[in-house]
Structure formats: C-alpha cells, structure tokens
C-alpha cells in the first residue's frame, strides 16, 4: 500500500492515497498530477475560486455546479475531475491544497524521487534550476523534483526544504541574525 511507504496522514492523506492508487491502477499517475497542478495554478490565480474552495458558506450543490463549470472550462476531466467532485460532495474541497501536496509526495515516492520545496526571492533560470537539482541529487542520491515558490520577502538567496531537513540561505535570515547579534552586543 502506498500509505504505508510514505508520510501522508490525516484526511488529506487518505484522499491523496485513494486517488494515487486509482491513478496507478489506471496508469494515469502523471495525467492526474498534471491536472492537479493545473487546478492548483487556477487556485493561485483566481480569488473567486479560492473563496469557493475555502468557504463553508456555499451550499454543496452550488459549489458542485461552480466546480463542474470551472473543470469543463479548463479541460480537467476523467479521474481528476471525478475526484474533485467527490471532495466537493463530501464537503472536503477545502483540503484540496493539502491533498495535492500529499499526492505529489506519493508520486515522488512511486518514481523514486525526492521533492524539495524551494523558496526564492525571484524566479530562477532553467540553468540555475538544473544546477540546484544536480546539487540536491548529489546530497540525496535520488532525482529531485522541485516545488519552487517565489517570495520577494526573503530579499535574496533561497530556502530549501527536503524531507525533514531545511537550509535557509536567505538574505532576510542573515540580516535578522546580524540584527540579533547587534542587540546582544549593545
């Protein structure tokens, strides 16, 4: 069972595991991942969709109709669409972001990859992304998939989370360390 091999837990982990096992059985793991990535991107772009997903105020049937319209418009169908509709019918659509993260972890485990969450101040070039993947592969011994998030508040550098390890090489952290040291000295 996939759930025994990975660290997904809770409601989102159970849903992600069920989706992963169905996708694996239907040989659609990558297709479902691509659909979920598209849905997550839509969530990031649309405040209305984010509100629909997170708010308990919407009636289940209204939420279901709206979700169906969105899925039809962006071309998400099959297993992915049915899964999102099940989440909606069960009033669990609010956990979709956690389900997507857990699904990605299951896919990475299935493919023998590690997944690193990388936060940068500005978007990295393809050359820099490849160099980062090579460096992380030398540390882990596995291919590394990157989830890159741009956060200008870190000022510069990057923060890498890989499993239970985290390396914070951000300029914000370095400046805060200097500030703290100056307070201690003064």
UniProtKB/Swiss-Prot annotation:
Keyword Transport (UniProt): yes
Source species of the chain: Bradyrhizobium diazoefficiens (strain JCM 10833 / BCRC 13528 / IAM 13628 / NBRC 14792 / USDA 110)
Protein keywords: ATP synthesis, Cell inner membrane, Cell membrane, CF(1), Hydrogen ion transport, Ion transport, Membrane, Transport
Topology of the protein relative to the lipid bilayer: Peripheral membrane protein
Function: F(1)F(0) ATP synthase produces ATP from ADP in the presence of a proton or sodium gradient. F-type ATPases consist of two structural domains, F(1) containing the extramembraneous catalytic core and F(0) containing the membrane proton channel, linked together by a central stalk and a peripheral stalk. During catalysis, ATP synthesis in the catalytic domain of F(1) is coupled via a rotary mechanism of the central stalk subunits to proton translocation. This protein is part of the stalk that links CF(0) to CF(1). It either transmits conformational changes from CF(0) to CF(1) or is implicated in proton conduction.
GN (gene name): atpH
InterPro entries recorded: ATP_synth_OSCP/delta_N_sf, ATPase_OSCP/d_CS, ATPase_OSCP/dsu
Record-level GO BP terms: proton motive force-driven ATP synthesis
Cellular-component GO terms for this entry: plasma membrane; proton-transporting ATP synthase complex
Family in the record: Belongs to the ATPase delta chain family.
Oligomeric and partner information: F-type ATPases have 2 components, F(1) - the catalytic core - and F(0) - the membrane proton channel. F(1) has five subunits: alpha(3), beta(3), gamma(1), delta(1), epsilon(1). F(0) has three main subunits: a(1), b(2) and c(10-14). The alpha and beta chains form an alternating ring which encloses part of the gamma chain. F(1) is attached to F(0) by a central stalk formed by the gamma and epsilon chains, while a peripheral stalk is formed by the delta and b chains.
PROSITE patterns linked: ATPASE_DELTA
Listed Gene3D superfamilies: N-terminal domain of the delta subunit of the F1F0-ATP synthase
Protein known as: ATP synthase subunit delta
Chief place where the protein resides: membrane
GO MF annotations, alphabetized: proton-transporting ATP synthase activity, rotational mechanism
HAMAP family: ATP_synth_delta_bact
Subcellular location: Cell inner membrane
């Amino acid at each position: 069972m996939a759930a025994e091999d990975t660290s997904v837990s809770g409601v989102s982990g159970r849903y992600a595991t069920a989706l992963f096992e169905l996708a694996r059985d239907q040989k659609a793991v990558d297709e479902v991942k691509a659909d979920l990535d598209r849905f997550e991107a839509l969530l990031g772009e649309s405040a209305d969709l984010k509100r629909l997903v997170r708010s308990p105020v919407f009636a289940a049937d209204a939420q279901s109709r709206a979700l169906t319209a969105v899925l039809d418009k962006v071309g998400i169908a099959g297993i992915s669409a049915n899964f999102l509709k099940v989440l909606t019918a069960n009033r669990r659509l609010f956990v979709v972001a956690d389900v997507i993260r857990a699904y990605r972890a299951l896919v990475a485990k299935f493919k023998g990859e590690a997944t690193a969450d990388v936060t940068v101040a500005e978007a990295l070039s393809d050359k820099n992304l490849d160099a980062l993947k090579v460096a992380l592969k030398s540390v882990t011994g596995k291919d590394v998939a990157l989830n890159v998030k741009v956060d200008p508040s870190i000022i510069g550098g990057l923060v890498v989370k890989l499993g239970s390890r985290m390396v914070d090489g951000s300029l914000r952290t370095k400046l805060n360390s200097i500030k703290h040291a100056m307070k201690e000295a003064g």
